[in-house]
Amino acid sequence: MSIKSDKWIRRMAEQNGMIEPFEPGQVREAAGHKIISYGTSSYGYDIRCAPEFKVFTNIHSTVVDPKNFDEKSFVDMHGDYCIIPPNSFALARTVEYFRIPRNVLTICLGKSTYARCGIIVNVTPFEPEWEGYVTLEFSNTTPLPAKIYAGEGCAQVLFFESDEVCETSYKDRGGKYQGQRGVTLPKT
């Protein structure tokens, strides 16, 4: 299993629709202002956060249960940025839609710009033949409100190609998050 380069990522995105929309270079500026970078890097792809958020709240004092998740635990927000309360978290989704090849697994790591501010971005691996918009989890580990930005980079996806094709892919087993479109809450 080897990590894939910018050339491979570009080819797979442009010829096979692996990432849509796709940015072949690194974008570091928009409308004359510096932004948190996104697009193709040497050995990965920096994904962007879309302008739809679900911010965790304790207004209804429900129990957090991944097997029986109460949607009232979140407040929906839309905009160019989102403020996460202290010691809380928000869910978002990527701007990009992914189609992962059968012989590829990805690992996604939060960008250091956010990590250095106490904002942790968590994403599980994208499994072989998974496709959809990626649900992102932003944890504010600080005692202060934290700001995250839509349309800017938030995490980097690393692509690993196996030397053999898997026997059973995510699509084959009917994965519960296959084809997800918006910010997707826990499912069992």
Curated annotation (Swiss-Prot):
Pathway: Pyrimidine metabolism; dUMP biosynthesis; dUMP from dCTP (dUTP route): step 1/2
GO BP annotations listed: dUMP biosynthetic process; dUTP biosynthetic process; nucleobase-containing small molecule interconversion
Single GO MF annotation: dCTP deaminase activity
Enzyme class: hydrolase
HAMAP family referenced in this protein's UniProt entry, alphabetically: dCTP_deaminase
Summary of subunit composition and partner proteins: Homotrimer.
Name used for this protein in its record: dCTP deaminase
